[in-house]
Structure formats: structure tokens, C-alpha cells
Amino acid sequence: MSHLAELVASAKAAISQASDVAALDNVRVEYLGKKGHLTLQMTTLRELPPEERPAAGAVINEAKEQVQQALNARKAELESAALNARLAAETIDVSLPGRRIENGGLHPVTRTIDRIESFFGELGFTVATGPEIEDDYHNFDALNIPGHHPARADHDTFWFDATRLLRTQTSGVQIRTMKAQQPPIRIIAPGRVYRNDYDQTHTPMFHQMEGLIVDTNISFTNLKGTLHDFLRNFFEEDLQIRFRPSYFPFTEPSAEVDVMGKNGKWLEVLGCGMVHPNVLRNVSIDPEVYSGFAFGMGMERLTMLRYGVTDLRSFFENDLRFLKQFK
């Protein structure tokens, strides 16, 4: 009991010198453990008279409490220092720019298709689709394209065999629709088409959209008004538009539509015409009762004109520097 103060002082000195939590725990065991110096002081109580034991026990407990408080204080200091050191090692320079989240965007051709579908959807047109591997009847014969027509030549069309081919136009969708339902018909048919050609303004695969109306009392005036409104809506300009007489086997009369470019020159944008009576007969629709108009346009060409793209192949090269311009 006489050297109790010395034990407390010794314990506090050891505590203050502990450099980490592990060393501090060794000090705790040395002084407060089961066989620690201060714990063993309790065994000396039995040597005292009974009436002195409570007071002596209180003194020992007070000494142990002082050491425990010193341990707690030092442990808090060491843990705080360790935390500060870890935080310093993990410091983040908040002035550095964060990682950018790259948002995707629609392909410019997809944007064009969506824009056109939206316009014609408001006019009551529905979207129709068909197979890309087509037979010669739906791609040619039913559309009033005879066997000797140049479009059937190998250098223009990808043939699988004598009767199957990659469709050269989405007009086959019109034939399938007219075979499946009677007028009134009002559809647009977007999709991929294939032609054996590749240069700055042509690719072997491109996107086309065709439109078809079949009903009673449909005239060329209806066709002109519809396309006139469409082109001004698509280009968002009060464009000068002209219709030039042309020839397509599946329409009569036929026309090609031009718009005046910013350079003062006419630019061809689409082809159109009144559905040929032979086409209506091929799908069992009476041309004496019903009439209709059809139009077809290349999605890549319209996209090029709208955004000022000069090379059609840019749409298929997957160059992000090009595609990001259309987000």
C-alpha cells in the first residue's frame, strides 16, 4: 500500500510513452490485468484488520480509476492521431474535375425517322413493317416493275437466288398492307433497304421511308398539300418547293420533289405519285372506286440536308466525334 502512488505514477509514465493502441493495451494488462500490479494490491487487504479494509480498498480503487482514466485519454489521443493520419493519406483534391458521365444519344438517322413518324402520326398514319429478305413478287412484280426492268439486274440488287433478294425499297410493305386490308389505308413504312452501290452519296444499306394513302377521292392535290406541309415542318423553314414530272413504274402520274437550297440551287428530296391502277389491281383493289398516292424518301439524304452532312458514309463509321454533334 505504501508504494501505491509510485505505481500510479509509473503507470501514467508508461501510458504517456505508448506510441500506439497495441502498446497502450500492454500497459493496461501490466497494471490493470488479472495479474497486474494494481490488481494484486487488492490481495494485500487480507493482511489488514477488518475495520481498515474498506478504506484501504477505496484507496486502491481510486488508484486504479486514475490509471484507467489515463488509459482512456491516451487511447482517444492515439485513435484521433491515427484517424488524422489516414485522412491525410486519403486526401482528395476537390479542385480536380470529377469523372464525366457520358450520356448516350440517338443516331442522327434515328432522329430523322422519329421526327417524320411524329409528323405523319399526327395526320393519322400508322407505322407498318415488313421483311428485309423479300421475294421478287412483292419487291418488283406487284409494283408494276416488269422482268426486263434495269432494277432487277445483278449490279443493282443483292439476289439470294432466282426469286429471293434483299429488298431494294420498302414498297413491298405497301403491297403486303393492301393485300391484308381494304381501304381506307394510311401508312408509312420505314426500314432498311439494300442496293449494290457504294460511294460518297450511296451505301449498300440505307434507310428509306415510304408513305401510302388509298381511299376514295384521293387526288394529286392531296399529295402536294401533304408533302408541302411535311417538308416545311421537317426543315423548319418556309421553303420554296417544286414538283417535277418524273417516272416510276408503280405511280402514274409521278413526280420528284425539290427544295431550294441556301446556295440558290434546287435539291432533290423525294419521289412521289398517284398509285398506278395496275398496282391496285394486283392487290384486288378496284381502281375505279379507290385512288391513292405514295411517296418515298431516303432517311440519310434528308438527314444530310437537315444537318449539312456532306458524306453519307459518315453515318455508318461510328466515329463518336461525328455522332456527338447530334446529342
From Swiss-Prot:
Cofactor(s) this protein cannot do without: Mg(2+)
Note describing how the cofactor binds: Binds 2 magnesium ions per tetramer.
Top-level taxon in the UniProt lineage: Bacteria
EC number: 6.1.1.20
A single MF term (Gene Ontology): magnesium ion binding
Any single Gene Ontology cellular-component annotation: cytoplasm
Stretches of the chain forming a coiled coil according to its record: none
Extent of the signal sequence: none
Catalytic activity: tRNA(Phe) + L-phenylalanine + ATP = L-phenylalanyl-tRNA(Phe) + AMP + diphosphate + H(+)
Database matches in InterPro entries: aa-tRNA-synth_II, aa-tRNA-synth_II/BPL/LPL, Phe-tRNA-synth_IIc_asu, Phe-tRNA_ligase_II_N, Phe_tRNA_ligase_alpha1_bac, Phenylalanyl-tRNA_Synthase, tRNA-bd_arm
Pfam family, one: tRNA-synt_2d
CDD domains found in the cross-reference section: PheRS_alpha_core
Cited HAMAP family: Phe_tRNA_synth_alpha1
Annotated protein name in UniProt: Phenylalanine--tRNA ligase alpha subunit
UniProt organism field: Shigella flexneri
